[in-house]
């Protein structure tokens, strides 16, 4: 992306600026496609993509596929290191129905999307952590997952 109003860089962060701006163009990190009519559809962020067993999994696609599961309030999908597959797709859920468990969510995913895209594990929280801009704080969730802090399987 380039424009007259584009930012010129990160304040005192030349390494981040070098990653984001090249030849005057901003690398947004968005992944998307153009349809036959030329409309651009943004499907996810490159940094959020999970590569599991050589297959690309877009967390936003998994989240959208499960968005209407009864009793599911919110879902955050991301990748974690996995010895066999490189990365595994996992999820953290907020539920309004206490009977909605890990097996039910994985089963719902299997019915709606390709099997390789389904979460291999689901953990539960009362609320998803948020950044100052109210986005789900996936880096915090990844750290919590790695450390096993505050995430329960039921």
Predicted feature residues:
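Acidic/polar alpha-helix N-cap and adjacent early helical turns
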Residues: 143-154
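AMP-binding/adenylate-forming catalytic core of the ANL superfamily
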Residues: 3-4, 8-9, 16-19, 24, ...
């Amino acid at each position: 992306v380039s424009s007259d109003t584009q930012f010129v860089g990160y304040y005192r962060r030349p390494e981040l600026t070098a990653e984001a701006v090249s030849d005057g163009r901003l690398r947004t990190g968005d992944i998307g496609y153009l349809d036959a009519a030329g409309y651009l559809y943004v499907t996810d962020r490159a940094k959020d993509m999970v590569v599991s067993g050589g297959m690309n999994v877009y967390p936003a696609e998994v989240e959208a596929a499960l968005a209407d599961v009864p009793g599911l309030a919110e879902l955050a999908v991301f990748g974690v290191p996995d010895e066999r597959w490189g990365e595994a797709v996992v999820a953290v859920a907020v539920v309004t129905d206490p009977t909605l468990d890990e097996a039910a969510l994985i089963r719902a995913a299997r019915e709606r999307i390709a099997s390789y895209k389904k979460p291999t594990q689901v953990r539960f929280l009362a609320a998803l952590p948020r950044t100052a801009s109210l986005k789900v704080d996936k880096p915090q969730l990844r750290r919590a997952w790695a450390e096993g802090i505050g995430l329960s399987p039921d």
